[in-house]
Amino acid sequence: MLDALDAPQKDELFHTDERTLYQYLDRAAVDFVRETRCLTKTVVLTTVAAQQAYDLPADFIELYLKNRNDRFTVKYYDGSDYFWPLLTSFDRIFRGNLTDNQDYPLRFAIIDKLSQPALINGTTTAAGAKTAGQCILTDGAKAFLTTNLVYPRDVVHNVADKSDGLVLSVTDATHLVTALFTGKKNAFGNGDSYVIQRATAKQLYLDAPSETDGHTITVPYICMPDPVYSDYGFWRLPATYCHGIACEAAFLFQNREGDYVSADRHHILFTQEIRRMRSEQARAALQPGAGRY
């Protein structure tokens, strides 16, 4: 990003708070992935009896895999057999009005989350010093993989330190890797109160409530890039595309500063990088064996 700026702009950039710089880069990386659909992940959801809506991760963009009929699908496993529910509209599910629990779904929809996510409140059970821009949130009383489900990109507040930031990754049931800003230490002490705001915006909505606990729904999806808000964070992207992303971050900064000519030049470089990746994706899709079976 620095290479794309002239000397006065670099000086101005150094007086910009650290989080804002990361936000420019993150926004550019997210836009790149949205345009190219180049990053994928898989999440496994676990059914709960009588439940119909299941939260998707905060980095969910859209579904990824289709069947041979060009229909989006997910994989449902009941412990012995696999089923392949198909994407439909929420309107169709609503009109179908299936209120009785079903053994397995035939259809599902992707919807906006129906209710505001509940806050996760807690107190740390160990200190987490800031190292290379990251700090560990430890809470032995929580279950961040299940009951107190947390995903990367959820927002975290250290009430004691008056700092806030993002969850970068979930290490295990009791540990989160975070990046904090605007506080006194931007780290966690033992016994610090914290609040996590879940950033989940989408849900997978089954055509009927689940009959049984413990079945799994495997959802392949196009995902946002990992949040890079620390010294050694990096995106799961080929390095050849990172220059274009940095140019878009420079565009966002220059646009704010009123340097529209330079901003437009860098935005053009970004769009050229998007076209290049799309061209490479198209060539790969034409290779032998690339068809859908």
Q: Could you tell me what each predicted segment is?
A:
Residues 1-123, 135, 150-152, 159, ...:
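Glycine-enriched, solvent-exposed interface loops adjoining structured elements
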Residues 127:
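Acidic (Asp/Glu) carboxylate-rich active-site/surface patches
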Residues 132-189:
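Extended, beta-strand-rich, solvent-exposed assembly scaffolds of outer structural proteins
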